[in-house]
């Protein structure tokens, strides 16, 4: 199994070397990076609320402060409710205390529990999650929030959901 994983890793590295323009996109879907898709580079609507709830961090109740050690995985699950439209794409955003930002593509997931609670068409896919395998971010203090591109063409951002410390 380890040899097969090594083979697949090498295959991915070879592909990225042949297609350098795609490397940033690949990284963005696997870890926090400075890359940001064009639709997440526009102006955030302040007049429309993005309601978010942090469900779990590493499959447990969220801590007040997450200490995320270098080289360790991280899994975060949230549900979100845009004030207008439905979620089309989601990015998890870590903003460092010095203003630097790192984003990672969120995966939209079905949340039947949220849909049952909201009784609103289109809320089935309002869950989002990330599952990163490692952490190579600079040491420092960060705040985690969610950015969502909606079906109405609006860019929304949640209030900070979690304080993250990387030693």
Give the ranges of each region predicted by the language model.
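Intrinsically disordered, polar/acidic, low-complexity terminal segments
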Residues: 1-75, 163
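Extended low-complexity, serine/threonine- and proline-enriched intrinsically disordered segments
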Residues: 84-105
């Amino acid at each position: 199994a380890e040899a097969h994983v090594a083979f697949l890793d090498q295959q991915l590295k070879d592909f990225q070397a042949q297609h350098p323009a795609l490397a940033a996109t690949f990284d963005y879907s696997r870890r926090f990076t400075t890359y940001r898709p064009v639709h997440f580079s526009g102006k955030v609507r302040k007049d429309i609320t993005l309601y978010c709830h942090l469900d779990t961090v590493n499959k447990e109740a969220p801590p007040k402060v997450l200490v995320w050690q270098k080289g360790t995985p991280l899994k975060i699950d949230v549900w979100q409710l845009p004030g207008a439209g439905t979620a089309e794409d989601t990015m998890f955003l870590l903003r460092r205390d010095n203003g630097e930002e790192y984003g990672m593509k969120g995966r939209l997931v079905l949340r039947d529990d949220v849909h049952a609670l909201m009784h609103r068409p289109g809320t089935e896919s309002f869950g989002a999650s990330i599952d990163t395998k490692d952490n190579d971010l600079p040491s420092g203090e960060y705040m985690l929030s969610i950015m969502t591109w909606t079906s109405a063409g609006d860019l929304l951002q949640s209030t900070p959901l979690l304080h993250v410390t990387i030693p």
